[in-house]
Amino acid sequence: MQKISNAEIAAIGTEILLGDLVDTNSAWLSQRLAALGVNVYRHTAVGDNRERIVAALGEAAARSDLVVTTGGLGPTSDDLTHECLSLLTGRPLAEYPEARRHVDEMFRRFGRKPTPSNYKQALFPQGSRLIPNPLGTAMGALLEHEGTLFATFPGVPGEMRTMFEETLAPAIRERTEGTIVSRTLWFAGIGESALAERVQDLLDARDPTVAPLAGEGKVRLRITTRAATPEEARKKIEPVEREILSRLGRYYFGRDDETLESAVGRLLRERGETLAVAESCTGGLLAKRLTDIPGSSEYFREGIVAYSNEAKERLLMVPREVLAEHGAVSEPVARGMAEGVRKLSGADYGLSVTGIAGPGGGTEEKPVGLVWVGVADGRGSEAVRLDLSAWARSRAAIRERSANMALDLLRRTLKKAKEA
């Protein structure tokens, strides 16, 4: 049995090339293959064309131990994956009775009758091992050919993921040497370049590898290594993690699946404290993210979206004269919003965001991307000015970064209170 150390992924479908469909499957597959110890070297997207699909699969097979395809397993004339795999390998298509029965059974569940074209999904290159699909009509295939294992999956993400975990993942485990383990550390309040400067020697190391990735006001460092067992891999990762945190601990908010909102929720829950938020330019995004966390009712009191000056005055008790003198996007108003929502809700903390998300509405004095975030507690309030003008063309990016930086301001406030 040939070992699998590397792979390529081919997403098949003209709709991907046209931009009508975003290929999330390849990203998910890359993460899962890496976790199983397989290096993914290339992603390919190819339209519904026989010659191009055959060429893409042939090129991938020449380079890789494993070629994974998604899409092209339907019953229509432009679903060509198994036909092209047959052409590439020289193995004729054959109808598999098991697959035909599966099509019949799935249609029976749907309360419908299959048409002759539906039985195209029972055709596979001879020698294929079928991949069961408990969620749809399209079964996949595992096929060995000249040192390469092909694995075909439907393009529907839920079906593909279930089939991968139940069939391909166990097959890969039998064919890999050792295991790859990764740990992700999350940071906020520091830029990618500043963070990289502090750990450059670790970024230059080969085992474990440390790789940064920034996005929307957060930076992550992924530590990755290969070892014979997961336990041995973790022992190699832990000293590197400790060294990173000794240098960057003040910016660290969690590992792996932790988010800023879950980190804030954990700190509030530990202290038995509560939070309310007042939002303007983020339009409820803060409240939405905070309440996405299961159990957030333990600490989240309420959220107010006060978009207009009149609403800020009426709902949050921001004085009219403060709004008139400083404008809605200002330090006094951000502090007033945080103080107001805290007082009105009876929460321990108030958190606020006010800014200009664009793409219009900016001035020379207050350009698009100017944002103030504020926090208030029993000791007083503070506000921080954010310059997000680099993202002036993306309203969504400004809102997302504003929410992240507001959450990080609250996180740092909670940590200070905990350490006091």
From Swiss-Prot:
Matching Gene3D superfamilies: 3.30.70.2860, CinA-like (3.90.950.20), MoaB/Mog-like domain (3.40.980.10)
SUPFAM superfamilies to which the protein is assigned, alphabetical: CinA-like, Molybdenum cofactor biosynthesis proteins
Domain of life: Bacteria
SMART domains: MoCF_biosynth
A Pfam entry, by short name: CinA_KH
PANTHER family reported in the protein's UniProt record: NICOTINAMIDE-NUCLEOTIDE AMIDOHYDROLASE PNCC, NMN AMIDOHYDROLASE-LIKE PROTEIN YFAY
Family, similarity comment: Belongs to the CinA family.
This protein's name: CinA-like protein
Organism this protein belongs to: Rubrobacter xylanophilus (strain DSM 9941 / JCM 11954 / NBRC 16129 / PRD-1)
Species classification: Bacteria, Bacillati, Actinomycetota, Rubrobacteria, Rubrobacterales
